[in-house]
UniProtKB/Swiss-Prot annotation:
Residues covered by region (Interaction with BCL2): 110-157
GO biological process: apoptotic process; autophagosome assembly; autophagy; cell division; cellular response to glucose starvation; cellular response to nitrogen starvation; defense response to virus; early endosome to late endosome transport
Cell compartments where the protein resides: Cytoplasm; Golgi apparatus, trans-Golgi network membrane; Endosome membrane; Endoplasmic reticulum membrane
Topology within the bilayer: Peripheral membrane protein
PANTHER family according to UniProt: BECLIN 1 (PTHR12768), BECLIN-1 (PTHR12768:SF6)
Main location per the UniProt record: cytoplasm
Organism: Bos taurus
Name the record gives this protein: Beclin-1
Keywords from the named record: Acetylation, Antiviral defense, Apoptosis, Autophagy, Cell cycle, Cell division, Coiled coil, Cytoplasm, Cytoplasmic vesicle, Endoplasmic reticulum, Endosome, Golgi apparatus, Isopeptide bond, Membrane, Mitochondrion, Nucleus, Phosphoprotein, Ubl conjugation
Amino acid sequence: MEGSKTSSSTMQVSFVCQRCSQPLKLDTSFKILDRVTIQELTAPLLATAQLKPGETQEEEANSGEEPFIETRQDGVSRRFIPPARMMSTESANSFTLIGEASDGGTMENLSRRLKVTGDLFDIMSGQTDVDHPLCEECTDTLLDQLDTQLNVTENECQNYKRCLEILEQMNEDDSEQLGLELKELALEEERLIQELEDVEKNRKIVAENLEKVQAEAERLDQEEAQYQREYSEFKRQQLELDDELKSVENQMRYAQMQLDKLKKTNVFNATFHIWHSGQFGTINNFRLGRLPSVPVEWNEINAAWGQTVLLLHALANKMGLKFQRYRLVPYGNHSYLESLTDKSKELPLYCSGGLRFFWDNKFDHAMVAFLDCVQQFKEEVEKGETRFCLPYRMDVEKGKIEDTGGSGGSYSIKTQFNSEEQWTKALKFMLTNLKWGLAWVSSQFYNK
């Protein structure tokens, strides 16, 4: 409630408001308190608070002669309470007045004054429900509240007075009637109390049922939350499975499209592309033959022969044809024919050129043997298709191919004692016959 601040040789004491805690500056009158002022400040609100028990009874007896005094026209009864200063001045709350010290306010006088002021505020706080000291604003607020309470109390007093007047006007009959009504009301009260007890019992039962229902509702909420989590998980899995299903369906559609495309694709035509490049017949862009003006590398010629052997071997397997006298062995650019009469005899369909090429006739024998296999393929096709005819007739014994539709000349498939131009043309005619055979096999076995 009080604080202190030390500065050099003096001490300034300040108090704070007990409501807003703001620092207060005390009025100068606190420095010159006399005995009467102190008694007025410390006196209780009611005079009976200072009386002894015997004196209180005597006061009450004396006051019974004139309990109410009409002082205003508003009908409010008031009792006169003598002020505390009219009572004995020798009370426990008396103070010893402190004057100014001769030395201008020593620390001892300041401490005594602080103690007197603090005790004064404590006594004032003990006499009422309000703690002291208060600032001016809080005091105004407190006064407003007290005025409001006073108005409410005055209104209550007026209401009590009106009720008293009504009671005084009632006669004895009304009293008897009121007694009967009172008994009826007492019975009604007992009945209502019984109903209240029944309602209370029902309330307890309902409260127990409510607790059970709330527990069940909480359990259902937990189950609902669990079901919601499971539903969300299943929904996520469903979405993932839907995505996978759509992906699989797209893959199936793509695979079906590729399958339909493959079904429509001629495997032989796609694998073996026979065409021509100038005077050369080509298979898969490999030229078969050579000219003085265009010396094709033997590696390319050997690769073309490898593709040609592979084509005839595939056509024969498709038809189920077994060649007589020779067996085709596709082996890339080192393909050859194997003699069935002499297993150790191999006829190579590849050559490296050089001087050995002119004296070694195995390459020529291999090309004639291959022409024999083409002739066997033609004869096998003619057994089932009499109208089938190749554009160039082949003479296996001489190893030549005749240009029946053109000049009518014959061209040897051998290299010895033959020009490169005629050899290249014979190979071109042979590839043309194979192209016709490939087209026939594709037409016959396309849907098989």
